[in-house]
Swiss-Prot record:
NCBIfam families in alphabetical order: L21 (TIGR00061)
GO biological process terms on file: translation
Species annotation: Anaeromyxobacter sp. (strain K)
Keywords assigned by UniProt, alphabetized: Ribonucleoprotein, Ribosomal protein, RNA-binding, rRNA-binding
GO molecular function per UniProt: rRNA binding; structural constituent of ribosome
Gene that produces this protein: rplU
One term under GO cellular component: cytoplasm
KW Hydrolase (keyword) present: no
Classification via PANTHER family: 50S RIBOSOMAL PROTEIN L21, LARGE RIBOSOMAL SUBUNIT PROTEIN BL21M
Keyword Ribosomal protein (UniProt): yes
Full protein name: Large ribosomal subunit protein bL21
């Protein structure tokens, strides 16, 4: 059974046991999180919510709070100046523990 969840302005297709890197969530490592479920499928026909499904839950456990690999932004002008900036986007890694329909 799989589900499509919404978090951080994005949608993810998850199943029980999946590890997903999502936009940063408030919470400590080992904490529990619940997600809005948009679609459930895998057994017969898929159920689609309008916009979410009532009575369907997807629970996860926070495994890590970290940052992605650094992205470098480099600008150079012909006048001779350069500008180098970096950015590391924070994320939360979640282990999907249950998908209940």
């Amino acid at each position: 059974m799989y589900a499509v969840i919404r978090t951080g302005g994005k949608q993810y297709r998850v199943a029980q046991g999946d590890r997903v890197k999502i936009e940063k969530l408030a919470g400590d490592v080992g904490g529990k999180v619940n997600f809005d479920v948009l679609l459930v499928g895998g057994e017969g026909e898929a159920k689609v919510g309008t916009p979410t499904l009532a009575g369907v839950t997807v629970e996860g456990e926070i495994v890590a709070q970290d940052k992605h690999k650094k992205v470098i932004h480099f600008r150079k002008k012909k006048e001779g100046w350069t500008k180098k900036r970096g950015h590391r986007q924070p994320y939360t890694e979640v282990l999907i523990t249950t998908v209940r329909a």
